[in-house]
Structure formats: C-alpha cells, structure tokens
C-alpha cells in the first residue's frame, strides 16, 4: 500500500519531512509541489543509497492519493528513475489499480520497465495481453516487457551504445552504434515504420534524440525535424514520447510542432500536456510564454495543470536558477 502522508517508520529526517509535507499537501500550489518532487527525486536516486533514499521514495509514493493525474504520473516517472527495487511495489500497485488515471498507470508501467527487474514481467505481460485495457496501457506494457528482457539479455552486453548527454533511464535504449556514419533518413524510416515493434521504434527515437544534442551538433536540426514527424503517428503513446523527448532536448526547432500539438483540441490530453511541458523547457525562447498562457483555462485539467508547471519552468529558465527544485537546505538539489 502507498505510505500515508505522515508515515515516518524509518525515522525522522527534517529535509525529507519538509519536502513530503509540501508534496502531499493539496493546499500547496502545484508548481511548488513539483519542485518538492524533483528535490525528493534527487534524494531517491542517490547511488549508493543514503539514509535519505528510502524515506524519499516513501515520500514520493505517499502522494499517489492526490487527485492530480499530472502529479501522479510524474511521481511514477521519478520512481522509475531511482534504480532502486524499493520503488517496485508502489509502482506495481499503481499499474494494477484500474481506478487510477490511465496516464498514471501508463507511467507506472513505463517506470517498471525502466527499473528493469524481472519480477515485474508477469503483471506487465498480463496487462499487455488484456484486450479490455486501454491501448496506451497495453502498448506501454509491451515496451516495458521488451525493455526488461533486453536489460537482462546477452544482447545488451554485446551492444555498443553511443554515450548520451542524458542521464535519464529511458523506455528503450538507443539503437546500437553503426559501424558507419549514422544516417538520419535511415533512422527516421525506422522511427516511422508502424510495422515494427514499438520497442524498436523507440530505439530509433532515442537514437535521433542523441543525434540532436548538443543543439549545435551538425545533425541536431535534421534529427529534430525527423522526430517531429512522429507527432503524426497513429499511436498516442508514441506521440507523447516524441513530445517528452523534445522537452529533454529544448531545441528551438521543435517549437512549431510542439505548439501545433498543444493547440490541437482534438489531440489527446497526454500528448498535449507533454507538449506544454516541453515548451516550458524552452521558456526563454521568444513567444513561448505567450503561447502557454493561452491554455491556462483549457477545458482539460491535465493541460491546465501542465501549463502552470510549464510557466513555472519557463520562469526558472529565464531567471537562470541552478536547479528546478524546492531547496529546504543546501544538501538538496534536483536531478
């Protein structure tokens, strides 16, 4: 079961308790709760673990009772980045709970894939094969199963992967390094080939991401343009991941396609919200803040919430703050 907001069975820690209270309080502004979450994520992701690691994981999991789908999906993402088996039971509980928001359950499934533990395979396979589950859940579980199998395979040990600028644990690794110069058209073809398994298409996606960073790389703009074509894919899950990758890249060439996705009232919420947050990472670019403000009263709650967080992130980008976090003391920063 998820720990309560006040549960502190592993002993008091002033930093974690302060952050936990902010994160789990429905009276706190959403942007402040997100900053608290990213501070807790930093503590939860410490390698090797510290005395604050488990309490930080418990603090993150305590907020799964929130009514905010946006916050809960971010909790699941953060737990998936911890590389810690203590996160697994909380995520398994969420992914099995059909009363939870679909976006949150999807993120929990993806997080289980990121953690890579084989004891999650059974529940992921059951959900993948259940035709009564929403497509986004089945597709996410399909990718997560493939990722766990890859993580624990001899194939992984044999593959040579390009060093990435990104420290995130992704839903799929990039494609193995080619013996020749990487061809963006070839990778794009793989990205857009709907006959391929989603896991393989995701590998192409993250290969293109790595060819787009840093932004002054000769391949960067072409890689972003190739990724942008994925925003027209029939899979909402795939489209949302493209938007997430654009948020990581913060490349100005992605602004037109992200703006189009956010502005499309016929697009699903999980894609539009991801587009909003990605635009938030580009908040110092001309016109982005004005675009985001147009959606502060959007009919969809998750889009409205994302715009609030995105504008807070944009402010952080403009102000040149060191970390997007809530810092109770000098020992905490956001990962």
Curated annotation (Swiss-Prot):
<comment type="similarity">
    <text>Belongs to the deoxyhypusine hydroxylase family.</text>
</comment>
<feature type="binding site">
    <location>
        <position position="273"/>
    </location>
    <ligand>
        <name>Fe cation 2</name>
    </ligand>
</feature>
<keyword id="KW-0963">Cytoplasm</keyword>
<keyword id="KW-0503">Monooxygenase</keyword>
<dbReference type="InterPro" id="IPR004155">
    <property type="entry name" value="PBS_lyase_HEAT"/>
</dbReference>
<feature type="repeat" description="HEAT-like PBS-type 3">
    <location>
        <begin position="200"/>
        <end position="233"/>
    </location>
</feature>
<dbReference type="GO" id="GO:0005737">
    <property type="term" value="C:cytoplasm"/>
</dbReference>
<keyword id="KW-0539">Nucleus</keyword>
<dbReference type="GO" id="GO:0005634">
    <property type="term" value="C:nucleus"/>
</dbReference>
<dbReference type="GO" id="GO:0046872">
    <property type="term" value="F:metal ion binding"/>
</dbReference>
<dbReference type="InterPro" id="IPR027517">
    <property type="entry name" value="Deoxyhypusine_hydroxylase"/>
</dbReference>
<feature type="binding site">
    <location>
        <position position="241"/>
    </location>
    <ligand>
        <name>Fe cation 2</name>
    </ligand>
</feature>
<dbReference type="InterPro" id="IPR021133">
    <property type="entry name" value="HEAT_type_2"/>
</dbReference>
<keyword id="KW-0479">Metal-binding</keyword>
<keyword id="KW-0386">Hypusine biosynthesis</keyword>
<comment type="function">
    <text>Catalyzes the hydroxylation of the N(6)-(4-aminobutyl)-L-lysine intermediate to form hypusine, an essential post-translational modification only found in mature eIF-5A factor.</text>
</comment>
<feature type="repeat" description="HEAT-like PBS-type 4">
    <location>
        <begin position="238"/>
        <end position="264"/>
    </location>
</feature>
<keyword id="KW-0408">Iron</keyword>
<feature type="repeat" description="HEAT-like PBS-type 2">
    <location>
        <begin position="104"/>
        <end position="130"/>
    </location>
</feature>
<feature type="repeat" description="HEAT-like PBS-type 1">
    <location>
        <begin position="71"/>
        <end position="97"/>
    </location>
</feature>
<dbReference type="InterPro" id="IPR016024">
    <property type="entry name" value="ARM-type_fold"/>
</dbReference>
<keyword id="KW-0677">Repeat</keyword>
<protein>
    <recommendedName>
        <fullName>Deoxyhypusine hydroxylase</fullName>
        <ecNumber>1.14.99.29</ecNumber>
    </recommendedName>
</protein>
<feature type="binding site">
    <location>
        <position position="240"/>
    </location>
    <ligand>
        <name>Fe cation 2</name>
    </ligand>
</feature>
<dbReference type="InterPro" id="IPR011989">
    <property type="entry name" value="ARM-like"/>
</dbReference>
<feature type="binding site">
    <location>
        <position position="74"/>
    </location>
    <ligand>
        <name>Fe cation 1</name>
    </ligand>
</feature>
<feature type="binding site">
    <location>
        <position position="107"/>
    </location>
    <ligand>
        <name>Fe cation 1</name>
    </ligand>
</feature>
<feature type="binding site">
    <location>
        <position position="274"/>
    </location>
    <ligand>
        <name>Fe cation 2</name>
    </ligand>
</feature>
<keyword id="KW-0560">Oxidoreductase</keyword>
<feature type="binding site">
    <location>
        <position position="106"/>
    </location>
    <ligand>
        <name>Fe cation 1</name>
    </ligand>
</feature>
<feature type="repeat" description="HEAT-like PBS-type 5">
    <location>
        <begin position="271"/>
        <end position="298"/>
    </location>
</feature>
<dbReference type="GO" id="GO:0019135">
    <property type="term" value="F:deoxyhypusine monooxygenase activity"/>
</dbReference>
<comment type="pathway">
    <text>Protein modification; eIF5A hypusination.</text>
</comment>
<feature type="binding site">
    <location>
        <position position="73"/>
    </location>
    <ligand>
        <name>Fe cation 1</name>
    </ligand>
</feature>
<dbReference type="Pfam" id="PF13646">
    <property type="entry name" value="HEAT_2"/>
</dbReference>
């Amino acid at each position: 079961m998820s720990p309560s907001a006040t549960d502190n069975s592993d002993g008091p820690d002033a930093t974690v308790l302060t952050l936990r209270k902010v994160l789990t309080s429905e009276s706190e502004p959403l942007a402040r709760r997100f900053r608290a979450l990213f501070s807790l994520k930093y503590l939860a992701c410490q390698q090797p673990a510290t005395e604050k690691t488990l309490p930080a994981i418990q603090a993150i999991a305590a907020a799964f009772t929130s009514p905010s789908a946006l916050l809960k999906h971010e909790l699941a993402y953060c737990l998936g980045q911890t590389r810690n088996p203590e996160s697994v039971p909380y995520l398994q509980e969420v992914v099995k709970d059909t009363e939870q928001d679909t976006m949150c359950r999807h993120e929990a499934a993806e997080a289980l894939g990121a953690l890579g533990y084989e004891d999650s395979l059974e529940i992921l396979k059951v959900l993948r094969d259940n035709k009564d589950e929403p497509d986004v859940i089945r597709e996410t579980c399909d990718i997560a199963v493939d990722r766990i199998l890859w993580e624990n395979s001899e194939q992984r040990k044999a593959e040579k992967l390009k060093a990435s600028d990104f420290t995130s644990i992704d839903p799929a690794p990039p494609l193995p390094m080619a013996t020749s110069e990487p061809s963006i058209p070839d990778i794009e073809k793989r990205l857009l080939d709907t006959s391929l398994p989603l896991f393989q298409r995701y590998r192409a996606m993250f290969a293109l991401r790595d060819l787009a960073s840093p932004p002054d790389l000769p391949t960067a703009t072409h890689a972003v343009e190739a990724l942008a074509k994925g925003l027209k894919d029939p899979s909402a899950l795939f489209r949302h991941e493209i938007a997430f990758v654009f948020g990581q890249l913060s490349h100005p060439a992605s602004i037109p396609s992200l703006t189009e996705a956010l502005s499309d009232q016929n697009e699903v919420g999980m894609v539009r919200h991801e587009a909003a947050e990605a635009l938030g990472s580009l908040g110092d670019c001309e016109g982005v803040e004005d675009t985001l403000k147009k959606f502060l009263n959007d009919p969809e709650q998750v889009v409205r919430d994302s715009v609030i967080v995105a504008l807070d992130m944009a402010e952080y980008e403009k102000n040149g703050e060191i970390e997007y976090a809530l810092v109770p003391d000098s020992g905490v920063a956001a990962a």
